[in-house]
Amino acid sequence: METPFGALQLSRHKTAFSPAHKALFVADVHLGKAATFRSLGVPVPAGTTQENLDKLSECIAEFNPLSVYFLGDLLHAKMAHNPDLLGKLLAWRAQHTNLAMTLIRGNHDSKAGDPPASLNISVVEEPFMLGGFALCHHPQTVQNALVLAGHEHPVVVLN
């Protein structure tokens, strides 16, 4: 996909890659969401954290970025700061130590808290400028920039 600020390559795992910046963009990972729902009695499957991390690793292998930008909501809730999830996240991060990683804070990040410093993920506020791209969590207008944002989740209504 061509933009005024360079190409973006879209992946089947709902990420985007900027070849010019060697940057991978991913939004709304929501690690720990399934465990949070299960704790509230909602029957959702286990194992989604590892599946999501594996998909991210596939995207990293496919595009070979120098940096990964999380466009908000990396962690779903404070419950994500548990030994099991953080252990998986630390093991995943150890596989990708060569990559710079930045989290643009989203609405869930303010509730969940920043990722532990041991993950070596920088945390910034929106909009974060990368060339002509304004990296955000909440869709918004940024003058003279192309906004890359998350927050708006696809919705399916079942009758």
Predicted regions: what is each one?
Residues F17, A23-V26, A134, L146:
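Conserved beta-strand elements of the Class I
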Residues L24-V26, K33-M129:
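Core catalytic region of metal-dependent phosphoesterases/phosphodiesterases
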Residues H13, H30, H108, H137, ...:
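Histidine-centered active-site/metal-ligand motif
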Residues M1-K22:
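Zn-dependent metallo-beta-lactamase
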Residues L31-G32, T141:
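Active-site/binding-pocket entry motifs
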Residues V124-N159:
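Conserved beta-sheet core of the metallophosphoesterase superfamily
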Residues F17-P19, A61-N64, T97, T141-Q143:
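Flexible, charged surface loops at secondary-structure boundaries
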